């Protein structure tokens, strides 16, 4: 946001350079990458169109930002700084509605994965679940992803492929409920931040499903950045991590 841009400019001075560009514009992207070339050591790709509703209304806009924009960044990395580490913030939406079919058991304050699921081999292969959570073996096939989800699947797979096919150091981090300082939450995403906003302003908060009990876990941005740093220090080609 503009507010964060001004804050970074003020606090970091000449250590921070801001470029306002559209990741769909390969010319703009290549101009930036060619300026710094092999001096670029790390790319953290967080640019995206995040709204499911907007994606359904403007599928072409959504796909060109999330899928084509990611491809532009990958190509620029391959062309100008192929030894750099490329980190992509993907989403659990690549799994579509498959997580909705994972057997859950109701606890006092939340829903947990049914322990029996890890003992059922057919479910374990399909769902990639255990009491520890959901791993990367969960299938992305035969599910309804939403228009937004399909664009993210395409970009997710492309980041993996550039790692495995071209040998780039690419890591895909599939986030779920992310939160942290200055999180601009809204009703349809960033629910924990939005819940606090409603509480502070004494506004009603609408709860959807599951009897108001928690299903998914939140992860703090501090922990996510730590995961990024671990990958940067020990990169691999085309790896995927559920966060």
Residue ranges, per PLM feature:
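Catalytic Tyr-x(3-8)-Lys segment
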Residues: 140, 213-214
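Residues at helix-coil transition
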Residues: 34, 48, 200-201, 232-236
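Glycine/proline-rich active-site loop of Rossmann-fold NAD(P)-dependent oxidoreductases
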Residues: 153, 166, 178-194, 203, ...
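Hydrophobic pocket-lining residues that define ligand/cofactor binding sites across diverse proteins
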Residues: 77, 163, 199, 231-232
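N-terminal Rossmann-like NAD(P)+-binding domain of SDR-like oxidoreductases, especially those catalyzing
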Residues: 1-176, 222
């Amino acid at each position: 946001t503009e507010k964060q841009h001004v804050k970074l400019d003020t606090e970091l001075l000449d250590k921070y350079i801001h470029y306002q560009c559209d990741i769909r514009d390969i010319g703009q992207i290549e101009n930036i990458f060619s300026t710094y070339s092999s001096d670029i050591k790390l790319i953290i790709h967080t640019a995206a169109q995040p709204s499911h509703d907007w994606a359904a209304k403007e599928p072409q806009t959504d796909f060109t930002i999330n899928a084509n924009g990611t491809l532009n960044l990958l190509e620029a990395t391959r062309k100008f700084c192929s030894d750099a580490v490329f980190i992509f913030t993907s989403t659990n939406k690549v799994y579509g509605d498959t997580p909705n079919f994972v057997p859950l058991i109701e606890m006092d304050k939340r829903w947990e994965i049914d322990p029996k699921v890890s003992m059922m081999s057919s479910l374990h292969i399909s769902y990639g679940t255990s009491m520890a959570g959901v791993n990367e073996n969960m299938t992305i096939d035969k599910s309804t992803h939403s228009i937004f989800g399909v664009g993210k699947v395409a970009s997710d797979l492309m980041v993996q492929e550039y790692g495995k096919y071209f040998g780039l150091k690419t890591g895909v981090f599939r986030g779920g409920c992310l939160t942290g300082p200055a999180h601009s939450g809204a009703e349809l995403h960033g629910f924990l931040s939005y819940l606090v906003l409603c509480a502070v302003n004494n506004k009603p908060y609408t709860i959807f499903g599951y009897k108001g009990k928690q299903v998914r876990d939140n992860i703090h941005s501090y922990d996510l950045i730590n995961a990024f740093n671990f990958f940067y220090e020990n990169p691999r080609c085309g790896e995927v991590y559920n966060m």
